[in-house]
């Protein structure tokens, strides 16, 4: 059975966070769901965010290269953790490995680079409703670390198949039990 994911959000890196935030508010009629000095999440509907803007502390991003100003990634949401794991295993069997797996807390995410180097995120929402996701984003765990730790996707697949509860596997606490990589370094390099 083929599962078709749905588009979740896109992320843009910018040196002009306030101006970009206002532009998306004006152009899309979006509203701010969460923001801090380095990022802003906006939405136009019931989703916790459709547009994310990231302006690294201190700014100074050079003009567009694969790791600077412009589209950072597109994201697609799968209905269940099992569906995401199945897709991971299908891609792995074809030699397509995630560039970086991240337990954001609000989502469990696998980031891939396409042949041109564009980042594509395959994810599941870790909460049943957008309101729960938004509440989490305003909580201490998320505001302390908005990105989250990496995780080992094969270990996730094995734990899922072994019957470890999904409610445990979709937490940062579980992700931190696996080997860690530098998430931001992996996201910002080709």
Curated annotation (Swiss-Prot):
| Pathway(s) per entry | Xenobiotic degradation; biphenyl degradation; 2-hydroxy-2,4-pentadienoate and benzoate from biphenyl: step 3/4
Enzyme Commission number:
1.13.11.39
Q: Which domain of life is it from?
A: Bacteria
Q: Which CDD domains match?
A: BphC2-C3-RGP6_C_like
Q: Which SUPFAM superfamilies match?
A: Glyoxalase/Bleomycin resistance protein/Dihydroxybiphenyl dioxygenase
Where on this chain does Fe cation bind? 9, 73, 121
Which molecular function term from Gene Ontology is one that the record holds? ferrous iron binding
Question: What cofactors are annotated for this protein?
Answer: Fe(2+)
Say which family it is in: Belongs to the extradiol ring-cleavage dioxygenase family.
- What's the subunit arrangement here? Homohexamer.
* Protein name (Swiss-Prot/TrEMBL): Biphenyl-2,3-diol 1,2-dioxygenase 3
């Amino acid at each position: 059975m083929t599962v078709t994911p749905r588009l979740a959000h896109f992320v843009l890196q910018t040196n002009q966070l306030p101006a970009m935030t206002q532009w998306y508010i004006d152009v899309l009629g979006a509203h701010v769901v969460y923001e801090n000095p380095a990022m802003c999440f906006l939405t136009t509907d019931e989703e916790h965010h459709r547009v994310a803007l990231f302006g690294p502390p201190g700014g100074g991003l050079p003009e567009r290269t694969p790791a600077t100003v412009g589209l950072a990634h597109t994201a697609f949401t799968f209905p269940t953790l099992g569906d995401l794991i199945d897709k991971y295993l299908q891609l792995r069997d074809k030699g397509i490995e995630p560039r970086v797996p991240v337990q954001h807390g609000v989502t469990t995410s696998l980031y891939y680079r396409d042949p041109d180097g564009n980042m594509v995120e395959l994810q599941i929402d870790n909460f049943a409703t957008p309101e729960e996701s938004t509440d989490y984003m305003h909580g201490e765990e998320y505001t302390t670390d908005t990105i989250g730790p990496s995780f080992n996707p094969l270990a996730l697949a094995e734990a899922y198949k072994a019957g470890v509860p999904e409610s445990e596997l979709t937490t940062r606490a579980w992700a931190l039990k696996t080997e860690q990589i530098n998430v931001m370094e992996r996201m910002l390099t080709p």
